């Protein structure tokens, strides 16, 4: 058992955070002048990066911790990207990669102190990269001051265990 699993068991956090594998692809197209980010309701997005480069993401496979990309994942991304922006079909693939994102029930992260000097900051799922600057600043202030930011009061490890009703 790895240290992560021991900590999760010791602090009763097993059900809190699971991994969701996401695959992305970076394309280059010198003839496309797309400047706006496109988000689709199925989870696919197209993000213009450096001039003529476009990040296409992301697949979501729950409880999948495998390494690398799959043909199925790449096909899904390209099919949806091409449907929205047909000019992307003429692009060159620069890079493909995958990673595992921490997911929590209701997509609500955990940001809590679980023991003296031990904090859990996880579960930001698809928004982690976007929120990391402000979360990092807030957590640094919390560690230095010893005062948890009040806006994080709902993000406890015990939520769902107390004071909540489910229908």
Where are these regions (language model features)?
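C-terminal catalytic lobe of FAD-dependent flavoproteins
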Residues: 87, 91-167
């Amino acid at each position: 058992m790895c240290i992560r699993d021991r900590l999760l068991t010791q602090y009763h956090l097993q059900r809190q955070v699971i991994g969701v594998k996401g695959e992305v692809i970076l394309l280059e197209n010198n003839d496309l002048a797309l400047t706006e980010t496109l988000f689709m309701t199925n989870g696919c997005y197209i993000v213009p990066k450096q001039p003529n480069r476009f990040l296409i993401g992301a697949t979501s496979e729950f409880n999948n911790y495998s390494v690398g990309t799959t043909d199925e994942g790449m096909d899904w991304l390209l099919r949806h990207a091409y449907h929205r922006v047909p000019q992307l079909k003429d692009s060159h693939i620069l890079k493909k990669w995958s990673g595992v994102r921490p997911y929590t029930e209701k997509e609500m992260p955990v940001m809590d102190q679980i023991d003296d000097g031990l904090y859990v900051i996880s579960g930001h799922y698809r928004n982690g990269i976007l929120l990391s600057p402000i979360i990092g600043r807030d957590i640094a202030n919390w560690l230095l001051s010893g005062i948890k930011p009040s806006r994080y009061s709902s993000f406890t490890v015990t939520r769902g265990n107390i004071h909540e009703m489910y229908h």
